[in-house]
């Protein structure tokens, strides 16, 4: 990928220096806990991280579920294609709109029960709901959180009813062992258990998506409903044009980029140019050391500058920590709830960076999505049993600029 992250494009993503931003309001004061997390942050430098990059799909079949993809945008490739999350799990808890698919990460573990394992992230496309979400994520048990962003973990053993126990052939010929659930024709994400009463051919996950499909100017079901009913054919209508464009997520070890940068003093794609990081003090962090917010931002910039196109940071180590762009608004250990399935500890597994909004062509509008980082915490035991899709915990850090724009 060859992407020019010049200053103008960064501003469109609302990624900017924090030197002119006001402190975030509404978050509890966790100064003591933040001090503890600062000590741990130094350890994060020693833990290997895997970076994820958004690439256009190399072929039309690689994002199908039988190839166990990591992907962003488009529609999810459900691991268990039958027993999908349903009911309120699929909805934004604020506006009740069905959540939109953000990305999925294929992250198998050595345990047999997690031979196949994928994490799915969904979120409401409304920034207003994400702002309301900020207050909710600070709630601690037994208070119930309302969320506009949710993550689900699904895992399967090697022997399972859906896929062959052998590795899939890399030629597009691989087929799943069973068909999946019928999905909503509009979002292609959630189970389509509602059917158009007129043509009896088109399925929806909700009345909201049925209404959206009916009103759509680009692929209105109102126009073709009678034609489908008369023909007896299944729906071939395009999904919603509001879905984010689909990308494969390819992975590289961060250390490979660090070595490349150490051998090359210049980096044309760096978010922070080499001339800016090597000032009179010799280090951007020293330049910004007077301010916690600026220091945190500078550390974030410096860390990602070797691979500025990264959209995801992943680690299988339970000792790994997120790379926080903002000093305030970080969770402490008590803010991360225990697994609500087995009661075990949750730890950080991956984070989603705002660079992905560039690939999704998200504009800088009044209610446009923006975040500093999205950190996903999962059950350390990756517990099995119970529901096929277990909801995990996600923490969203916003920049104060995101808040002030609303």
Regions found by a protein language model. Give the residues of each.
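Preference for intrinsically disordered or flexible, low-complexity segments
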Residues: 1-406
């Amino acid at each position: 990928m060859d992407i020019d992250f010049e200053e103008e494009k960064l501003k469109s993503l609302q990624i900017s220096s924090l030197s002119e931003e006001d402190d975030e309001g509404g978050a509890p004061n966790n100064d003591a806990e933040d001090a503890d997390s600062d000590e741990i942050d130094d350890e994060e430098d020693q833990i290997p991280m895997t970076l994820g990059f958004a690439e256009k799909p190399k072929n039309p079949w690689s994002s199908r579920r039988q190839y166990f993809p990591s992907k962003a945008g488009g529609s999810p490739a459900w691991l268990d294609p039958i027993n999908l999350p349903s009911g309120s799990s699929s909805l934004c808890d604020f506006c009740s709109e069905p959540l939109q698919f953000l990305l999925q990460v294929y992250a198998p573990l050595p345990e047999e029960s997690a031979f196949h394992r994928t994490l799915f992230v969904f979120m409401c496309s409304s920034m207003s709901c994400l702002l309301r979400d900020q207050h909710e994520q600070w709630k601690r048990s037994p208070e119930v959180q309302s969320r506009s962003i949710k993550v689900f973990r699904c895992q399967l053993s090697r022997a399972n009813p859906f896929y062959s126990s052998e590795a899939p052939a890399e030629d597009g010929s691989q087929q799943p062992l069973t068909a999946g659930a019928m999905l909503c024709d509009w979002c292609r994400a959630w189970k389509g258990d509602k059917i158009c009463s007129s043509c009896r051919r088109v399925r929806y996950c909700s009345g909201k998506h049925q209404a959206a499909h009916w009103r759509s100017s680009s692929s209105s079901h109102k126009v073709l409903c009678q034609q489908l009913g008369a023909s007896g054919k299944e729906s071939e209508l395009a999904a919603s044009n509001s879905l984010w464009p689909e990308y494969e997520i390819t992975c590289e070890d961060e250390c490979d980029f660090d070595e490349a940068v150490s051998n090359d003093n210049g980096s044309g794609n760096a978010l922070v140019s080499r001339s800016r990081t090597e000032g009179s003090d010799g280090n951007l962090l020293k330049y910004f050391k007077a301010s916690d917010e600026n220091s945190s931002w500078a550390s974030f910039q410096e860390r990602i500058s070797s691979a500025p196109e990264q959209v995801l940071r992943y680690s299988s180590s339970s000792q790994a920590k997120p790379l926080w762009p903002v000093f305030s608004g970080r969770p402490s250990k008590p803010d991360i709830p225990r697994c609500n399935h087995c009661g075990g500890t949750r730890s950080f597994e991956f984070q989603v960076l705002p660079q992905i909004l560039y690939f999704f062509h998200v504009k800088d509008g009044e209610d446009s999505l923006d975040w500093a980082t999205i950190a996903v915490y999962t059950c350390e035991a990756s517990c099995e049993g119970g529901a096929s899709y277990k909801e995990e915990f996600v923490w969203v850090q916003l920049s104060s600029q995101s808040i002030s724009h609303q």
